[in-house]
């Protein structure tokens, strides 16, 4: 892949910088020497986002007693007043993806009409498969289906005219089959079409404006059709600052979940005290390991760790399918998809919801969290998807990871529900969220081994997320440079750990959720505007002929 004199990526069809701009990648950067280390940073984006995060960490650690109720109140206010906005936005992203699939815009090719894929179809699909795995699946694979199942089983509860239960929709009082179907549908809703539509749109925007338009691989580039040269000024600075801050807090939320589950697993297996100190030590140790991975580089560090973790995750998944209720899992996979499709209209309704605890406590938080993660996942997907048509890109980016998520939730959540319903195993029903995975594995063969594998999965996902996340953040904070000095990634990796510690000490997972929602709110607006700009940009792109599209297939 070559570049032009502006630093833009040269299109294979000979056209360079489809957008005519004098901007050069890194032209606003400042080169600094800090001791033996050299830095190459976008002055305003790096400085403002870095200072904002430093102030947050210092304030949170200084006023621990005060910030805990503040975070709880902030989260409650945001999700209770703006849940409709998050849900409606999620629906918009899904609809736009469907429109791009069925309209002629789907024939636009990422990289230009003559572009060829950088990776084989199998290799590309494998990377999309990997994108669907992470700390979230390990943490929520058992806990979320069981939570929605138990809430649905309890049915609707109203006190003083206010619904106080957490059941999705109307629940299913005493009917375990109906409660299971509803619980799985409510879970899959959070892990399938909607989140992956968010990732697909942002990834597509980054890919089109980098590979097709020759602009830097940063968030601001997507907005060029709407704001023109102003994206290189404060309009763009604000967009990139929001992207950096949202990504840091989105990652910190995931790291908080990972630390909580790893500490719970160590307590369950080895009696390690479940304290703030334990979780802080875990975050420090795992962040240190992530730093080693950062220094080792992509090929020696995160790539190998990702391969190891994918193998471990696949082994644990197949173990649960084979040792668990195999036929129930295999048939449940299709039944759960059917239940999900049936319940999508009700689950995605943004207004006049009666199940407000579910829609506000789960869905609004999830959408904000996914949106804050979108620069991280989106940039990874964009960088590996050159040469694919828009239609092919969206279908695969949504369907492949969604299928992985549905299979994982069906295997782990379905096994746990079966243990309770068919075997009377109440520990998995009553356990706290971080403990449910280990409670499920505890009554299966080789429990100690699989539980240790579960902890290793969380730890390595923690490391790879932190490493990859620091790369994405650094690319944005370095003005789109993908080869910025390693010390900058070390800086951001360290900051992610510090933010996770601050959130853990300032209110635990509730604080992490509050900040994910808070930073996700402005970035939702950014992503909605980016969607409009993306469509405008796609309309200017040459499209493959119908014959060429059929030939590719």
From Swiss-Prot:
This is Glycine betaine/proline/choline transporter VP1723. InterPro entries: BCCT_transptr. The lineage of its organism: Bacteria, Pseudomonadati, Pseudomonadota, Gammaproteobacteria, Vibrionales. The chain crosses the membrane at residues 43-63, 85-105, 122-142, 191-211, 231-251, 278-298, 310-330, 362-382, 393-413, 443-463, 490-510, 515-535. GO terms for molecular function: transmembrane transporter activity. Pfam families: BCCT. It is a multi-pass membrane protein. Involved in the uptake of osmoprotectants. Can transport glycine betaine, proline and choline. It comes from Vibrio parahaemolyticus serotype O3:K6 (strain RIMD 2210633). GO terms for cellular component: plasma membrane. One of its GO terms (biological process) is amino acid transport. Keywords: Amino-acid transport, Cell inner membrane, Cell membrane, Membrane, Transmembrane, Transmembrane helix, Transport. The keyword Transmembrane helix applies. Belongs to the BCCT transporter (TC 2.A.15) family. It is found in: Cell inner membrane.
